[in-house]
Amino acid sequence: MQQIKFIDLFSGMSGIRKGFEQACRKQSVACKCVFTSEIKPAALEVLKQNYPDEVPYGDITKIETGDIPDFDILLAGFPCQAFSFAGKRLGFEDTRGTLFFDVARILKAKKPKGFILENVEGLVTHDRKDPTQKIGRTLTVILETLEALGYYVSWKVLNAKDFGIPQNRKRIYLTGSLKSKPDLSFETTPSPKLKNILESGLPTESSPFIKKLLKKFPPSELYGKSVKDKRGGKNNIHSWDIELKGAVTEEEKQLLNILLKERRKKKWASEIGIDWMDGMPLTKAQISTFYKHPDLQNILDSLTDKGYLVLEHPKQKIGGQRIKDESLPKGYNIVSGKKSFEINKILDPNDVAPTLVAMDMEHLFVVDNGGLRTLTGKEGLRLFGYPDDYSFDIPKKDKYDLLGNTVAVPVIKAVSERLLHTL
């Protein structure tokens, strides 16, 4: 087979490119990237470090197809966006105004031999009006558009942990060829444990929060624990478990643990005539129905003063948003937020990592050297199957942002091999 020329759109860290190149090498096929498009500054810096002789193009929406060299394969990890349906279905034209439109217009103009697209699992049911349908309108239009362009298209949701990566990461992969439909049935590979990719003996962090956490729990007991005040469960540590906001009595702790579960019951919303909200503020009278204590008011006051509880109005659902209804009596609620604490989860080295997303990565910690630390850049790369020699010299915050949005390289490699078989 002669040299395969490919383009890499929405390149990010070039993960799709990496996987495709690995597949080509495995099959002894020469390949060359002739065009790269990316706009994020941190990603452009990483691309410069790894491909110093190449100059990426910018915003793909502003690039004419005539300015793109001829190529054989299109690679793209495009964002999931809804299409605007103005009455009659128009197929290709329905995609206008989205970044998939740019993928489609390039395929239409250049007619390459094939493509590989990657997206979040949610694309499968995105904009689905009927719950009984397997796929939503967005994916339906994408598939119809690709098939109308002459491609035999296959798609499948694949999990990175089935391809040798210790991360539970499901994504949808779409691939198409002008000759035949690529086969996306795979035998799964047992996933390695997180400990297989972790470094050891590195410096740990020592904030007041971490000191309180380690004072209450030895490191080995923290494996797999989440730290948040939104939920209960045996794998969850709450702020009162480590007395983060001040010492708590057994009675106070007992009340908090019961309230955490009770406030989620739908009957409380029904009692005051509002739509159910997950985490209702409850009045003293309501609390007294499930927690009977002669000193209840003092316990509630104490927990409010310390910052474990807040006295607030219930929220009505108005136009899809929750708005405080000041006509309803205030109730006691647990003070919580999605990013309440600097640690969201301590990863279990004997398990696989959860799906890594950009906004959560800096809140994921591992046990090391008798303490706790965040993931290193090298560990982050390994969790997506990047080689250790990949250059990644950018600030930690930017590393987490790029990693949370990148692809699992071994999955791309496997999909690429199937596409190459059709050429």
Curated annotation (Swiss-Prot):
One GO BP: DNA restriction-modification system
GO function terms (MF aspect): DNA (cytosine-5-)-methyltransferase activity; DNA binding
Keywords, comma-separated and alphabetical: DNA-binding, Methyltransferase, Restriction system, S-adenosyl-L-methionine, Transferase
UniProt KW Chloroplast keyword: no
Top-rank EC class of the record's enzyme: transferase
Origin: domain of life: Bacteria
Catalytic activity: a 2'-deoxycytidine in DNA + S-adenosyl-L-methionine = a 5-methyl-2'-deoxycytidine in DNA + S-adenosyl-L-homocysteine + H(+)
Alphabetized CDD domains for the sequence: Cyt_C5_DNA_methylase
Family named by the database record: Belongs to the class I-like SAM-binding methyltransferase superfamily. C5-methyltransferase family.
Task performed by this protein: A methylase that recognizes the double-stranded sequence 5'-GGNNCC-3', methylates C-? on both strands, and protects the DNA from cleavage by the NlaIV endonuclease.
Record-given protein name: Type II methyltransferase M.NlaIV
Native organism taxonomy: Bacteria, Pseudomonadati, Pseudomonadota, Betaproteobacteria, Neisseriales
Name of the gene this protein is made from: nlaIVM
